[in-house]
UniProtKB/Swiss-Prot annotation:
One of its GO terms (molecular function) is ATP binding. Catalyzes the synthesis of GMP from XMP. This is GMP synthase [glutamine-hydrolyzing] subunit B. Heterodimer composed of a glutamine amidotransferase subunit (A) and a GMP-binding subunit (B). It comes from Thermoplasma volcanium (strain ATCC 51530 / DSM 4299 / JCM 9571 / NBRC 15438 / GSS1). The gene is guaAB.
Length: 310
């Protein structure tokens, strides 16, 4: 079956499943971007695309998603809920607890938008690895996914998941077929919160946002899109180490760099970039962000590790 056939099947699924107004949360990642575009083509103004600025996003994420909505003439709203999310995460260090708090807060904000719009259906970009890792079909739960299991039992919206049988390579193939960018970096629903080990604060988010921008920029500059790792990102660690800034001792923060090669996100191997690229990334981070004085590289495959650290 071709990617064009997959697209037709998904649109038929949406057409047959939704008989009224629907809402979809768009993160800017590949899954929700693809689904929102296909659903918009089927439902028109009966679909409301909602982008929630959680304060846990990468640099320029809001502007990029707004441009996507405008380019495709989609019906959308952008909600700034950053303060709510960050306040709800105060004092929380457990990764599962973080995910659940973010999921509940997200649904609360989304439900308000759904009520205002009069939506009866919730479209969600859940794909196969999401529900498999979340304990679907009698598997043990590896970790809760933002798209899976976070919906309240008394939710009045009917859930529709047209992508749940598809894998990442198929999502990318369909995106390419539609002319969507295929080099969009996968980004977890809970955002940078699960790339900060320990408590999430605005200061840590600002640091990690700057580091993430450097990592993505340096890899984009060094490698053509077809040669880049499948996913690459930074993690802020709760580890301070001794270093030197100028002629003074410094006790700075540590970041980990993760680059992974995979086709379906179910298994993967760590990427083996050039030493020159790793050195350039490390030097740029420590030069531009004085709070950080150590950069480490993650050489763990999946399994035993998951792609994200939390």
């Amino acid at each position: 079956m071709s990617f064009s056939d997959y697209i037709s099947r998904i649109k038929d699924n949406i057409r047959n499943s939704i008989k009224g107004k629907a809402i979809i949360a768009v993160s800017g990642g590949q899954d929700s971007s693809l689904l929102s575009l296909l659903a918009s083509e089927v439902l028109g103004n009966n679909l409301l695309c909602v982008f929630i600025d959680t304060g846990l996003l990468r640099k320029n994420e809001t502007g990029r998603v707004k441009d996507f909505f405008e380019k495709h003439s989609m019906n959308y709203v952008i909600v700034d809920a950053a303060d709510t999310f960050i306040n709800n995460l105060k004092g929380v260090t457990d990764p599962e607890e973080k995910r659940k708090i973010i999921g509940k807060t997200f649904i609360d904000v989304l439900s308000e938008q759904a009520q205002n719009f009069g939506a009866e259906y919730l479209l969600q970009g859940t794909i196969a690895p999401d529900w498999i890792e979340s304990g679907g079909q009698k598997r043990d739960t590896i970790k809760s996914h933002h798209n899976v299991g976070g919906l309240p039992k008394d939710m009045k919206l009917k859930l529709v998941e047209p992508l749940r049988d598809y894998y990442k390579d198929e999502i990318r193939g369909m995106s390419k077929e539609l002319g969507l960018p295929t080099d969009i970096q996968p980004f977890p629903g809970p955002g940078l919160a699960v790339r900060i080990i320990g408590e999430v604060t605005k200061e840590k988010l600002d640091l990690l946002r700057a580091v993430t921008d450097i990592v993505e920029r340096k890899i984009s500059e060094a490698m053509p899109s077809e040669s880049r790792p499948w996913q690459y990102f930074a993690v802020l660690l709760p580890v301070r180490t001794t270093g030197v800034h100028g002629d003074r001792r410094a006790y700075g923060l540590t970041v980990g760099i993760r680059m992974i090669e995979t086709t379906d996100a179910m298994t993967g191997t760590f990427s083996k970039p050039s030493w020159d690229l790793l050195e350039d990334i490390s030097n740029t981070i420590t030069d531009e962000i004085p709070e950080i004085n150590r950069v480490v590289y993650d050489i763990t495959n999946k399994p035993p590790a998951t792609i994200e650290w939390e």
